[in-house]
Amino acid sequence: MAILNLAKLINPVFDSVLYTLKSHVVLKGGRASTKSSVVSIDLVNSFISDPLGNVVVLRKVGKYLRMSVYEQIRWAIYEMGLANQFHFGKSPLQITHKKTGTAFYFYGVDDPMKLKSQKIAKGYVMAVWFEELAEFAGREDIDIVEDTFIRQELPNGKEVKVYFTYNPPRNPYDWINEWVAEKAGDPTYLIHHSTYLDDKLGFLSKQMKAKIARYKETDPDYYRWMYLGEVIGLGNHVYNMNYFKPLESLPDDDKVIGISFAMDTGHQQSATACGAYGLTAKAVSYTHLTLPT
């Protein structure tokens, strides 16, 4: 078998992804950063090194599998010169190694509970890839699906490698942005950020780079979100919610000089909320919100 030179296929910024020993790898960032290509190449490279290993590739909506992750894995196989070793099945959607019988399995997670009974006849699941993670409903989707494929004990102390790829939503309070922020402190997770600026091997076309440059000039906020992968907010908040903090009691050195009440009365099944808003001598406002139980 010819030796594959991955250095020609993957930008140096992804070295930490290729060589990490952590079981979970989150790749986020802007569009055109090549992160999905990196994962597909890494998965194929690992797959051919393990004759009993299978790979599960997931998207939230099953109808998008064929023209996205299926073709992405197929692209990686062709790019690595391995196409003659595989059978590319369409129904079921599966890419099978002709010699070993192990495969890449593609599933939609329209209903996560339906995947709980999935079994793979030969070998074991060595890797799972959640593509376009921001499309998933929440962390419960991840846990239900991941638990299905990591419950089998692997030989020689191996662990299932779990990949997540996504472009961060604008909203800082979107579940995925908060989830990834939490996982940054988990020793089993590698959080990796990349952008089109990390393309040192010249994969992006001049046309693509020119388009990005125009957005950078004409719409900087959109550019930061779309191509730098920054969480810029929705742009429609009067107040920045990061400045609102829970308070156990009022400070002893700051007296309340004014208080107002407001009520949002519900109708039929809708809740009624009553708010009390205080302003102190130091021009700090405090809010107490009461909801019916």
Feature locations, PLM:
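Conserved small/polar residues in nucleotide/adenosyl-binding loops
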Residues: 287-293
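Pre-P-loop entry segment of helicase/translocase ATPase cores
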Residues: 1-21
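Walker B catalytic acidic pair
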Residues: 131-132
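Inter-Walker segment of RecA-like/P-loop motor cores
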Residues: 73-123
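Short beta-strand scaffold segments in enzyme catalytic cores
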Residues: 272-277
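Conserved P-loop
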Residues: 24-90
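ATPase catalytic-site recognition across NTP-hydrolyzing enzymes
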Residues: 201-266
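ASCE P-loop NTPase helicase motor core
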Residues: 135-210
